[in-house]
């Protein structure tokens, strides 16, 4: 779990590099867990991005630095907090997803996100 008001790296090819989380939309809590949807502000972009600095976006949390028990006997620790940018209808804004994707996220109802995934733990 991670708290709100923290930075998340974006792991898709939208051109956004880093966002700052404002609100947890999935549940009314200041803690953020994987599979949560957050509201964030863009803090860092690449120079050819179609997004603007300080634009408000939605993000689907994929990876956290906190130790997670994804399967019953394995614990996973990632190096960064990462999100995938989505729109209001939960469709991904990018066309590719970079990095590892935990297996417990495959079981959710986000079929369009699951179809873009290449590396599954």
Swiss-Prot record:
Keyword Lyase: no
GO annotation terms (biological process): translation
Subcellular location: Plastid, Apicoplast
Family annotation (Pfam families): Ribosomal_L14
Gene Ontology terms for molecular function: large ribosomal subunit rRNA binding; structural constituent of ribosome
Swiss-Prot/TrEMBL keywords: Apicoplast, Plastid, Ribonucleoprotein, Ribosomal protein, RNA-binding, rRNA-binding
Any one Gene Ontology cellular component term annotated for this protein: mitochondrial large ribosomal subunit
The family this protein is said to belong to: Belongs to the universal ribosomal protein uL14 family.
Subunit structure: Part of the 50S ribosomal subunit.
UniProt function note: Binds to 23S rRNA.
Full protein name: Large ribosomal subunit protein uL14c
Source organism of this protein record: Toxoplasma gondii
């Amino acid at each position: 779990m991670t708290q709100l008001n923290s930075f998340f790296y974006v792991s898709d090819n939208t051109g956004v590099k880093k966002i700052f989380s404002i609100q947890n939309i999935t549940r009314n809590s200041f803690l953020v867990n994987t599979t949560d949807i957050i509201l964030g502000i863009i803090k860092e972009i690449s120079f050819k991005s179609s997004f603007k600095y300080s634009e408000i976006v939605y993000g689907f949390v994929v990876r956290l630095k906190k130790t997670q028990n994804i399967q019953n006997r394995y614990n996973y620790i990632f190096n960064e907090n990462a999100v995938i940018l989505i729109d209001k209808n939960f469709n991904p804004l990018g066309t590719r997803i970079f990095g590892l994707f935990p297996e417990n996220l495959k079981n959710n109802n986000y079929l369009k996100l699951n179809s873009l995934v290449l590396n599954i733990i």
